[in-house]
Swiss-Prot record:
Disordered, as annotated region: 359-399
TM segment ranges: none
The protein's name: DNA mismatch repair protein MutL
Chain's role: This protein is involved in the repair of mismatches in DNA. It is required for dam-dependent methyl-directed DNA mismatch repair. May act as a 'molecular matchmaker', a protein that promotes the formation of a stable complex between two or more DNA-binding proteins in an ATP-dependent manner without itself being part of a final effector complex.
Gene Ontology molecular function: ATP binding; ATP hydrolysis activity; ATP-dependent DNA damage sensor activity; mismatched DNA binding
Sequence similarity: Belongs to the DNA mismatch repair MutL/HexB family.
Family annotation (InterPro entries): DNA_mismatch_repair_CS, DNA_mismatch_repair_MutL, DNA_mismatch_S5_2-like, HATPase_C_sf, MutL/Mlh/PMS, MutL/Mlh/Pms-like, MutL_C, MutL_C_dimsub
Amino acid sequence: MPIQILPPQLANQIAAGEVVERPASVVKELVENSLDAGATRIDIDIERGGAKLIRIRDNGCGISKDDLALALARHATSKISSLEDLEAILSMGFRGEALASISSVSRLILTSRTAEQSEAWQAYAEGRDMAVTIKPAAHPVGSTLEVLDLFYNTPARRKFMRTEKTEFGHIDEVVRRIALARFDVAINLNHNGKLIRQYRAAPDPAQHERRLASICGPAFLQHALAIAWQHGDLNIHGWVADPAASHTLSEMQYCYVNNRMMRDRLINHAIRQAYQDRLNDAQQPAYVLYLDIDPHQVDVNVHPAKHEVRFHQARLVHDFIYQAVTAVLQQTNAPILNISEEGEVDAPRWQQENRVAAGTNKYAQPEAAKSSAAEQAVARERSSARERAAPAYKEDHPYQKQQGELYRQLLQPSAAAKPATSPAAIPASSVSSPSIPVQRITQAEEPLHGDNYSFGRVLTVFPPCYALIEYQGGVALLSLTVAERWLKQAQLSPPEEGLRPQPLLIPLKITLDKNEIAACQNHEKLLITMGIELSVEQGRATLRAVSLPLRQQNLQKLIPELLGYLSQHEEISPDTLATWLARHLGSEHEVWNVSQAIQLLTEVERLCPQLVQSPPAGLLQPIDIKAALATLTHE
């Protein structure tokens, strides 16, 4: 059979296989279109579980007569127009496939009117070529979509539909999820002429618990702990259930990314990990969580139904969610959200602890106790689709500006360097947290000027690990592995408050001998100072967190070696231990390239500026260019 272009109806039916799984899929797509249109009221009418009729009526902005025909065409949308728009999506829909796909497997009628039009217009597509017919109609400002006889022309799909009760149950669940995402929108759900759900609009944050109770039930609300956490462009708020009550609330698992309902495995894993020590294998956590993130940092165009997303910084997002949920669950005597007759909610007492992966817990401040948990949980919710606009996300994160300021300070004549004689001479600084300032060297012997703070330009790299650089008017070979060791020494030298522990994605189980167990107990404070969270029970250790420089190491091998080293010393300083660790950590690169060398030297110049003026043995070897030139010229 020769290659041929498929007719529009067949092409749309193929696309419908991905978009339209069952009546609930139709409801989801159409209601999301209403939300994108700025609707504040949506009425949903269902007959026979959606097999006979699905009607969605809204008071949104409507569709003009000139755009009605395009609305039913494939790949036609008003929500994106360029690749840049696709990379920063905030609207619910964007592909322009839903209406065309639905109309190809049903009898779809679209009626709409804009505020500028004096009358409404109705459109429907029919025939093999999906030709669109438009005629005048009576309708207020907004749109109504009627989907009749779903799958009437695809008997195989219709045969796989479940009972009326089952299909309506799926529709009810979709509406529940959407109602939790948009508190500011009133939603009514009718089945066979009977009002089943009525979710009144709750624009006031103090009223959000009312809708939460109507959707998730009073039992969830009574055991809910409010959460509100922020780090840079990441923000999470919502509610998590007390683990003691999770066995009765396991079905309550709702998560949203930029107000889009999700069933993402990374998010579920982070939440499950936060609960793992509080629930058995048969129990599931209960939660309603909202994650707001820079739309440039998340790709929603990876799943046909948009149920999953891909985060550009998946580990950061995972650790952020894990730490936020863990901090709330670790509250001692955390009160439940108990609604009084006046609708007031008692504020929980927040734990004074927050690791770098999760940012600063702004609700650990004394004044936070004066505000209600409801206000905390929804302080950053967007009010409506019309008012919601893409935030002006900054290109540089705050910590990058802070590091840049520190970098400029190093160029000032007032900064000074001390000659490096041993690894212990490296300044006690840490980069495991962007918020920890780099400590300057106070015992100055020679000022560090902007002209001589740098090693010089990297010319090339000789495999596996030597960089040829411009140095003091000549050239020199620099050992990248030695420079990396000095950098790790600086990163591992703890400040007064210690290194910040970074939680592992999965806690590591390690078997120890008696000497290693004794070393773990004797040097517990030192390990905490180094950002290592290690607990021992019945001869087995559980490693839960390490400082940032250790995250990429082979911890299964490194930790027993570290404890073996500690068992040989009764007392040891953090700087000495940092020196030992720096010499035992594996290199991140077997063979270096120019870009990796430039990145490494930039970090070394910022954190270890004293190495530039007084390079230690083994780091730098100048090359005598004059001798080479003399040989070439036979002088």
